[in-house]
Amino acid sequence: MKGIVLLSGGLDSAVCLAFGVRSLEVALCLTADYGQLAAGREIAAAAALSAHYGIRHQVVELPFLREIDCSALTGRLGLPEPEEMELDDPVRSAETARQVWVPNRNGLLVNVAACYAEALGCERIIAGFNREEAQHFPDNSPQFLDAVNHSLAYSTLSGIRVISYTQQLDKAEIVALGQRLGLPWSLVWSCYRGGDEACGVCESCRRLERAKRSAGGVRV
């Protein structure tokens, strides 16, 4: 069986790539550039991870998303910087989720990947969803996966399906899985910003740092 990985270069998608190369034939890694602040770092991380596993890498340009988007991820708003104690606060988490929400991003990316998958004869699209963020990002949820697969049954002739090896895991469990898979941590970029070093204070950095400690002090 052949598959395509939606690869941002971050924790979840990197672990899905590491798992995917052991589970099926990965034909392509796709990275989206929609004008996000971390686009350059994400593309570089995804390219390095793809090269590490010997997989072809391609960048898909989606400039219109930045033109219509008012998300903090594209710089239209200031990035939220929640304290670690706020990560499990449902009100604060819902607020930060709204700030970084990109309209229909995962729905769009899955369908772009489906075009490539069908053209390349791939049966699976691998995406890095997770249980922790599904609480406030519906496009990480099992319901989203079921719905998009129902749609793909009609929009593709070959019955392509989206799978995620991390969807039932929280961030600490994903870090632990990455450790078991021998993920090259130095190649991963999870920060919402695109500086020389991870900022350490955006929500993505906070969640990764907490996950590392929960997984036993993993050095990522």
Curated annotation (Swiss-Prot):
Keyword terms of this UniProt record: ATP-binding, Ligase, Metal-binding, Nucleotide-binding, Queuosine biosynthesis, Zinc
Pathway(s) of this molecule: Purine metabolism; 7-cyano-7-deazaguanine biosynthesis
SUPFAM superfamilies: Adenine nucleotide alpha hydrolases-like
Cofactor: how and how many bound: Binds 1 zinc ion per subunit.
Residues that, per the record, bind Zn(2+): 191, 199, 202, 205
Domain of life: Bacteria
InterPro entries assigned: QueC, Rossmann-like_a/b/a_fold
Single annotated GO MF: zinc ion binding
EC number, UniProt record: 6.3.4.20
Residue ranges that the Swiss-Prot or TrEMBL entry lists as coiled coil: none
Pfam families to which the protein is assigned, alphabetical: QueC
The UniProt record lists the keyword Secreted: no
Catalyzed reactions: 7-carboxy-7-deazaguanine + NH4(+) + ATP = 7-cyano-7-deazaguanine + ADP + phosphate + H2O + H(+)
Broad class of enzyme this protein falls into: ligase
Residues that span the membrane, as ranges: none
BP GO annotations: queuosine biosynthetic process
Binding site for ATP: 7-17
Function: Catalyzes the ATP-dependent conversion of 7-carboxy-7-deazaguanine (CDG) to 7-cyano-7-deazaguanine (preQ(0)).
Subunit structure: Homodimer.
Family affiliation: Belongs to the QueC family.
Name of this chain's protein: 7-cyano-7-deazaguanine synthase
